[in-house]
Amino acid sequence: MAPGRAVAGLLLLAAAGLGGVAEGPGLAFSEDVLSVFGANLSLSAAQLQHLLEQMGAASRVGVPEPGQLHFNQCLTAEEIFSLHGFSNATQITSSKFSVICPAVLQQLNFHPCEDRPKHKTRPSHSEVWGYGFLSVTIINLASLLGLILTPLIKKSYFPKILTFFVGLAIGTLFSNAIFQLIPEAFGFDPKVDSYVEKAVAVFGGFYLLFFFERMLKMLLKTYGQNGHTHFGNDNFGPQEKTHQPKALPAINGVTCYANPAVTEANGHIHFDNVSVVSLQDGKKEPSSCTCLKGPKLSEIGTIAWMITLCDALHNFIDGLAIGASCTLSLLQGLSTSIAILCEEFPHELGDFVILLNAGMSTRQALLFNFLSACSCYVGLAFGILVGNNFAPNIIFALAGGMFLYISLADMFPEMNDMLREKVTGRKTDFTFFMIQNAGMLTGFTAILLITLYAGEIELE
């Protein structure tokens, strides 16, 4: 509203407020106001609200500090009526208009309806690079978990642990996409645009279908003997058979097996889990399969190189998402890092096993898995540079789409695939179902809480 119009409005209301003192012009001015904004020379609460809006009682920067005013809050017309002892049904006449006029003037002059501007400063360059580098380093340590967890693969409880982490990855990736990355790509703010409830409904639609589908399958499935189930062509995913470990050419009378699973067969187990079985007199001899040499690169299956390259691209995009998120706010960078970390734990373990089955030694698998993970640092640098110099919305959109694909098209079928050989009856099936629910709901709740309380959490 133009300043002249605001001043005119203040003078008009001031003159109207003097109606009780100067009956002549004051009463005339009051009647002018009431005739324009009211009906039958009286004002209702709704008409007073319209008057306040027309006169410029809108938001403005520069709110007085608390304690300077008796009423330092934004007052609605109903609240003004209540403060002066009027009910909402009261009709303000000329005689009563002067009573509420000071309140109207106060609201017009100090503009308490304006929320205090929150200075949303971006993190400093040192904070962005420091927290980003720390997050990527912690995530990359997941690529080394294969060596630690390989001995646990044959434990009876390991499938349950892995199922929980896969469910956790699905929940965090999916929630991070719909709560933060995709809304941020469109420029939405959870405190202003109120999209969180709708995002919860999106997750709710996905979860309800998952819940009822699994319940129906458990109720209708016929559990046969020896752990096999029969439900038509009910397969949770494509049938995959574990290939036998590849035996590499004999070197100096020794045969090297890349897959550590064969260490049970009367061979010697080295630190790198490579079994060396003597084919002559059982005497252990030095093997060229130790250290990082292992089998020749030409003898390693093509699938190993495909996994390594695709994983490097995947980690590069992960780094982009972390870098761009950290430039926006450290909390959003933390949320994105948590989602990626939960996904990397089972993902890197699966890649590690695939590399072993493709013919790599354990140390070779660790080396190439770690090298592909290091591409996350390159992505982090690009993400920070783009986020500091350009709007990172495109990166958020790209990462959001990638997170949706990984969670729904990649890890969700993998989570169901894991049950095919492990389910031996309805009780076991229900146990895995509850573990899946626990993982997904834990990831969903964590990202939801971070989104809801992002304004109250400060990372110093």
UniProtKB/Swiss-Prot annotation:
Primary localisation category: membrane
Disease entry from the Swiss-Prot or TrEMBL record: Congenital disorder of glycosylation 2N: A form of congenital disorder of glycosylation, a genetically heterogeneous group of autosomal recessive, multisystem disorders caused by a defect in glycoprotein biosynthesis and characterized by under-glycosylated serum glycoproteins. Congenital disorders of glycosylation result in a wide variety of clinical features, such as defects in the nervous system development, psychomotor retardation, dysmorphic features, hypotonia, coagulation disorders, and immunodeficiency. Rare variants in SLC39A8 may be a cause of Leigh-like mitochondrial syndrome characterized by profound developmental delay, dystonia, seizures and failure to thrive.
Organism: Homo sapiens
Name the UniProt record assigns to this protein: Metal cation symporter ZIP8
Motif XEXPHE-motif: positions: 343-348
Location(s) in or outside the cell: Cell membrane; Lysosome membrane; Apical cell membrane; Basolateral cell membrane
Extracellular topological domain residue ranges: 23-132, 182-191, 387-388, 451-460
Induction remark: Up-regulated by manganese. Up-regulated by lipopolysaccharides (at protein level). Up-regulated by inflammatory cytokines like TNF. Down-regulated following phorbol ester treatment. Up-regulated by zinc and T-cell activation.
